[in-house]
Design a protein with these regions (language model features):
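N-terminal export/targeting and maturation segments
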Residues: 4-82
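Non-cytosolic head/periplasmic domains of membrane-anchored proteins
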Residues: 70-153
C-alpha cells in the first residue's frame, strides 16, 4: 500500500514539476504552444529561477513579467484564461488552449490579432524560464503524452 502511494505521489510530482520540459517534447498542433501553457498552469510547481529582467507573481494568479530596457511585457494566467500585455501596451486574451479570444489596444478598442507577432512576443517574454527547466531524472514523457496528447492536437 505504501509503495503504491509513494509511486503515485512521485509520478504526480514528477509530471507537475517537469511539465514544461515534457510539454517541449510533446507532438502538438501548430499554434497550441504546450510549453507556455504548462508553464503558466503549473507555475506553482515548475522551476522558476532568478533571471535578470524577469519577475514572478503568484498571489491569486500566476504571472511572468519581463522588463527589457524601458519595455515591459506580462503574461498572466488566472482560472482558464491567459492574458498577455505586450511591450506596446496591447492586451490579448486567450483560452487555456492558446486560442485568441480578444485583442485590445491600450484604450480597450478591438484590434486585429496578428498571431505570429503576438506569439513571438509571448515567447520572448517566457523563453528564458522555459530554457531553464531541468531535465527529469526519471523521464515520464510517455505518460505526459498519454494524458495531454488530445489537448494539444
Amino acid at each position: 500500500l505504501y509503495t503504491v502511494l509513494g509511486m503515485s505521489l512521485f509520478t504526480f510530482f514528477n509530471l507537475k514539476y517537469h511539465s514544461v520540459y515534457y510539454a517541449q517534447h510533446i507532438p502538438h498542433k501548430e499554434g497550441t504552444e504546450p510549453d507556455i501553457i504548462m508553464l503558466m498552469e503549473n507555475m506553482g510547481w515548475a522551476y522558476t529561477p532568478e533571471i535578470d529582467g524577469i519577475s514572478y507573481d503568484d498571489d491569486g494568479s500566476y504571472a511572468i513579467t519581463r522588463e527589457k530596457g524601458t519595455k515591459t511585457s506580462i503574461l498572466d494566467f488566472s482560472g482558464d484564461t491567459l492574458f498577455f500585455i505586450s511591450a506596446s501596451g496591447n492586451g490579448y486574451l486567450f483560452n487555456r488552449n492558446f486560442s485568441n479570444q480578444y485583442a485590445l489596444d491600450e484604450h480597450y478598442h478591438t484590434i486585429k490579432y496578428k498571431q505570429r507577432t503576438v506569439q513571438k512576443e509571448i515567447r520572448e517574454t517566457v523563453q528564458p524560464v522555459i530554457d531553464a527547466q531541468p531535465k527529469p531524472l526519471i523521464n515520464l514523457q510517455w505518460l505526459f503524452n498519454l494524458i495531454y496528447q488530445s489537448r494539444f492536437n
